From Swiss-Prot:
This is Store-operated calcium entry regulator STIMATE. It is a multi-pass membrane protein. Keywords: Endoplasmic reticulum, Membrane, Transmembrane, Transmembrane helix. InterPro entries: STIMATE/YPL162C. One of its GO terms (cellular component) is membrane. A motif (GXXXG motif) lies at residues 149-153. The GXXXG motif may mediate oligomerization. The C-terminus is necessary for its localization at ER-plasma membrane (ER-PM) junctions as well as for the store-dependent rearrangement of ER-PM junctions. Residues 277-288 have a biased composition (Basic residues). Its main location: endoplasmic reticulum. Residues 261-272 have a biased composition (Acidic residues). It comes from Rattus norvegicus (Rat). Homooligomer. Interacts with STIM1. The lineage of its organism: Eukaryota, Metazoa, Chordata, Craniata, Vertebrata. It comes from the Eukaryota. Residues 241-246 are annotated as: Required for localization in the endoplasmic reticulum.
Length: 288
């Protein structure tokens, strides 16, 4: 005759004991959104996003973006990455074998094939914007003063690019039948699996992606040069030509003095006025 302790030791079918045993060493469906998984995701977001702050301080001082411009640039990328992250979490639950492995495969595809697609998308959008002369939709330019509508429009364009990228990656995932791949099966600790999938691998890959994509979205030096060239052309059309000359004094021998065309005309008129009396004296034979 068995006591209550015997029943507990064996466990009832489908009871808590058997559930824990069957789930030991497995990354089960929904594990990515458990409390430990959410904690790792938040920690990853803070650490990875801090690389963008490091990137800003490493920019040359004459090209360093003001904090407001930097925030507008990086916030677009943060929104896009959040979309990709939650899309990967949703797609990871499509498999019953190992969601952690599927999330990791999705993430690595985003970091390789996805990076190329993002680059192509940003370049294609840039060509379209230049062709249509949509000034407010140029990535990294928000007007002077800053316009919230420009940021909203650029953010919407970037989300469209991310939707395109994620759709292509999902198609590749289906074609290659990678839903059945279980990369992390040799690892028995489910918390270690989550740490690898949500923190360790994504930290290095996300830092690289944030750094590179920020270069895609920020205002380029070529764009600045084009704007300056346009301003110079507009000034020349208005007739305000400018040239440089060397200073005549010894103390300022290495300095350059900017002289406008109007100043030159005033100097030439003054010299002409001084020469007129001399010419008249020569004409009448008077001593100069």
């Amino acid at each position: 005759m068995q006591g209550p302790g015997g029943n507990v030791s064996r466990g009832l079918p489908g009871g808590p004991a058997s559930t824990v045993a069957s789930g030991a060493g497995r990354c089960e469906s929904g594990a990515l959104m458990h409390s430990f998984g959410i904690f790792l995701q938040g920690l990853l977001g803070v650490v990875a996003f801090s690389t963008l702050m490091l990137k800003r301080f490493r920019e040359p001082k004459h090209e360093r973006r003001p904090w407001r411009i930097w925030f507008l640039d990086t916030s677009k990328q943060a929104i896009g990455m959040l979309f990709i992250h939650f899309a990967n979490v949703y797609l990871a639950d499509l498999t019953e074998e190992d969601p952690c492995s599927l999330y990791l495969i999705n993430f690595l595809l985003d970091a390789t094939v996805g990076m190329l697609l993002i680059y192509v998308g940003v370049r294609a959008v840039g060509v379209l914007v230049e062709w249509q002369q949509w000034e407010s939709l140029r990535f990294g330019e928000y007007g002077d003063p800053l316009q919230c509508g420009a940021w909203v429009g650029q953010c919407a364009l970037y989300i469209v690019i991310m939707i395109f990228e994620k759709s292509v990656v999902f198609i590749v995932l289906l074609i290659l039948q990678w839903k059945k791949v279980a990369l992390l099966n040799p690892i028995e600790n489910p918390d270690l699996k989550l740490a690898i999938v949500m923190l360790i691998v994504p930290f290095f890959v996300n830092a690289f992606m944030f750094w590179v994509v920020d270069n895609f979205l920020m205002r380029k030096g070529k764009t600045k040069a084009k704007l300056e060239e346009r301003g110079a052309n507009q000034d020349s059309r208005n007739g305000s030509k400018v040239r440089y000359r060397r200073a005549a004094s010894h103390e300022e021998s290495e300095s350059e003095i900017l002289i406008s065309a109007d100043d030159e005309m005033e100097e030439s008129d003054a010299e002409e006025d001084l020469r007129r009396p001399v010419k008249k004296k020569h004409r009448f034979g008077l001593p100069v």
